[in-house]
Amino acid sequence: MTIGLAHYLAVAAILFTIGVFGIFVNRKNIIVILMSIELILLAVNINLVAFSVYLGDVVGQIFAMFVLTVAAAEAAVGLAILVTFFRNRGDISVDDASMMKG
C-alpha cells in the first residue's frame, strides 16, 4: 500500500482541526494558543508539500520553507514577548494581555 495524496490531506486536516480546537477550548493561556497556531501552520505546510509533490512543481515546497521561516520567527518573537510579560506581571493569561498598552 502506498501513501497517496489523500493520506497527507487527511493528516493535515486532523492537525488543522486539533489546532483550531485548541484555540477555541483554551482561550485563557496564551502559550497554548501560540502552539495551536503552530499546529495550524504545520497543517498548511503539509498541504503545500503534498500538492507540490502531487503536481510535480517545486513552488509549493519553496513556499512551505518560507512559511516555516516566518513561523519560527513568529514563535521566537511571541515567546520573547510572553517571557517579558511574565516577568512584569507574574501571570500569562489572555485577560491580562488585552490590557497591555503600547
UniProtKB/Swiss-Prot annotation:
EC assignment: 7.1.1.-
Family: Belongs to the complex I subunit 4L family.
Listed name of the protein: NADH-quinone oxidoreductase subunit K
UniProt keyword annotation of DNA-binding present: no
Pfam families, alphabetized: Oxidored_q2 (PF00420)
Cited Gene3D superfamilies: 1.10.287.3510
Membrane topology listed for this record: Multi-pass membrane protein
Gene: nuoK
An individual GO BP term: ATP synthesis coupled electron transport
Protein function: NDH-1 shuttles electrons from NADH, via FMN and iron-sulfur (Fe-S) centers, to quinones in the respiratory chain. The immediate electron acceptor for the enzyme in this species is believed to be ubiquinone. Couples the redox reaction to proton translocation (for every two electrons transferred, four hydrogen ions are translocated across the cytoplasmic membrane), and thus conserves the redox energy in a proton gradient.
Keyword annotations of the record: Cell inner membrane, Cell membrane, Membrane, NAD, Quinone, Translocase, Transmembrane, Transmembrane helix, Transport, Ubiquinone
Record GO cellular component, one term: NADH dehydrogenase complex
Assembly, per entry: NDH-1 is composed of 14 different subunits. Subunits NuoA, H, J, K, L, M, N constitute the membrane sector of the complex.
Molecular function terms, GO-annotated: NADH:ubiquinone reductase (non-electrogenic) activity; quinone binding
Residue spans crossing the bilayer: 5-25, 30-50, 62-82
Catalytic activity line of the entry: a quinone + NADH + 5 H(+)(in) = a quinol + NAD(+) + 4 H(+)(out)
Subcellular location: Cell inner membrane
